[in-house]
Amino acid sequence: MTEVELWSRETRAQRACAALVKNGFDAVYVKTAEEAADLVMQFVKPGMKLGFGGSMTIKTLGIQDKATQAGAQVLDHNKPGLGAEEKLDILRSQLTCDVFICSANAVTMKGEMLNIDGNGNRVAALTFGPKKNVVV
């Protein structure tokens, strides 16, 4: 990526972040994946119950593993070997967790987040339930 392309992306990201703040979100721009993971982990404390929306971004950042290592209780509805009823119980329990962590499908330059969901747990958690939501 050229220096101009990098500057353009960073400028757009900062403008979108400012628009999110204008719309009432607590939004922070970070430059690197490592900074993003570190910022998310500031919300994770030992013993907390954490829910996760299905997110390749969160998976790539290694947040679930880091949260487990930090002593948090990870409510993982994608854990191998779960039966349908067990998975549904975990999805429901994510609605009352301490922190729900997910990513947005898109963020507009007007400061709007777009979220589409297969199970409904991410959209439900973003609108009602968890004590705090962290969206990457």
Set out the residue ranges of the language-model regions.
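The feature marks the mature, well-folded catalytic cores of soluble enzymes
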Residues: 1-136
